[in-house]
């Protein structure tokens, strides 16, 4: 084959055969799983996985308790309680991370709107969020989107209804979790997530070079499609 000739395109079946022939140590896979569970704060799952796999976590699992409490509060919509706990554990964190503090305050505003406490929501926005909105265009835009929910009888069905979705609470928790881990000088992104980002980067590079290859189109299901 000359230098100018292109190699034959690899089919999905050929690609899957190559993947199946790869030998990855189970212990390495188990360490990835344990790393994910610890980083995301899933203590009970990590304890159970340790017993099943024999893999020891990189940190004392008891140190996860505080993050678990914060997660439970945020996912229940108890934002003020979560802020108090964060301040008691890491007094300087929210002072040095103003966007994180704003997002927590914004989430409290969302919870007031969810509970149809209109007057309390307006007062909170004016006394707690207005100043940050004046200092940051990004914060102002987010605050305006949040307050726009008050214009609808059924805010859940409005164009801004995504703010009332439970995934919004999860988003705030993820931001808090990463900030706490960074503050404690601990790994804040699971190794598994880094590997998936590397996969997406590699596929993007191949796409830009117009290379045809079996592409993973659904990370959650591991779906791989034929070259196109």
Curated annotation (Swiss-Prot):
- Quote the PROSITE patterns the UniProt record gives: CTLH, LISH
Which superkingdom does the taxonomy of this entry point to? Eukaryota
Note whether Ribosomal protein occurs among the keywords: no
Q: Which InterPro entries match?
A: CRA_dom, CTLH/CRA, CTLH_C, LisH, Ubq-SigPath_Reg
Matches recorded under Pfam families: CTLH (PF10607), LisH (PF08513)
Q: Which UniProt keywords apply?
A: Cytoplasm, Nucleus, Wnt signaling pathway
Which molecular function terms from Gene Ontology are attached?
Answer: protein homodimerization activity
Residue ranges of domain CTLH in the record: 63-120
GO-annotated biological processes: positive regulation of canonical Wnt signaling pathway; positive regulation of cell population proliferation; proteasome-mediated ubiquitin-dependent protein catabolic process; Wnt signaling pathway
Q: Where is the LisH domain?
A: 25-57
**Keyword check for Cytoplasm:** yes
Localization of this protein: Cytoplasm; Nucleus
One cellular component term (GO) for this entry is: cytosol
Q: What does this protein do?
A: Core component of the CTLH E3 ubiquitin-protein ligase complex that selectively accepts ubiquitin from UBE2H and mediates ubiquitination and subsequent proteasomal degradation of the transcription factor HBP1. Acts as a positive regulator of Wnt signaling pathway by promoting beta-catenin (CTNNB1) nuclear accumulation.
Q: Name the family.
A: Belongs to the GID8 family.
> How does this protein assemble?
Homodimer; may also form higher oligomers. Identified in the CTLH complex that contains GID4, RANBP9 and/or RANBP10, MKLN1, MAEA, RMND5A (or alternatively its paralog RMND5B), GID8, ARMC8, WDR26 and YPEL5. Within this complex, MAEA, RMND5A (or alternatively its paralog RMND5B), GID8, WDR26, and RANBP9 and/or RANBP10 form the catalytic core, while GID4, MKLN1, ARMC8 and YPEL5 have ancillary roles. Interacts with RANBP9. Part of a complex consisting of RANBP9, MKLN1 and GID8. Interacts with CTNNB1, AXIN1 and GSK3B.
What is the name of the protein in this document? Glucose-induced degradation protein 8 homolog
List the source organism: Gallus gallus
Lineage, highest ranks first: Eukaryota, Metazoa, Chordata, Craniata, Vertebrata
């Amino acid at each position: 084959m000359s230098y100018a000739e292109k190699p034959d395109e690899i089919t999905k079946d050929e690609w899957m055969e190559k993947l199946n022939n790869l030998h990855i140590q189970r212990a390495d896979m188990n360490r990835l799983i344990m790393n994910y569970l610890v980083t995301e704060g899933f203590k009970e799952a990590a304890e159970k996985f340790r017993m099943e796999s024999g893999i020891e976590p990189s940190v004392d699992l008891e140190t996860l308790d505080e993050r678990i409490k914060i997660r439970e509060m945020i996912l229940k919509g108890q934002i003020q309680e979560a802020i108090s706990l964060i301040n008691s554990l890491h007094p300087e964190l929210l002072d040095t991370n103003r966007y994180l503090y704003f997002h927590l305050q914004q989430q409290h505003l969302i919870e007031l709107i969810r509970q149809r406490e209109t007057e309390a929501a307006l007062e909170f926005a004016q006394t707690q969020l207005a100043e940050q909105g004046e200092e940051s265009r990004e914060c102002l835009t987010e605050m305006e989107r949040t307050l726009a929910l008050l214009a609808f009888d059924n805010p859940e069905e409005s164009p801004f209804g995504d703010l009332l979705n439970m995934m919004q609470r999860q988003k705030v928790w993820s931001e808090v979790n990463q900030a706490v881990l960074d503050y404690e000088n601990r790994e804040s992104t699971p190794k598994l997530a880094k590997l998936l980002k590397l996969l997406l980067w590699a596929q993007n590079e191949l796409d830009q070079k117009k290379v045809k290859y079996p592409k993973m189109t659904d990370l959650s299901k591991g779906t791989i499609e034929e070259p196109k």
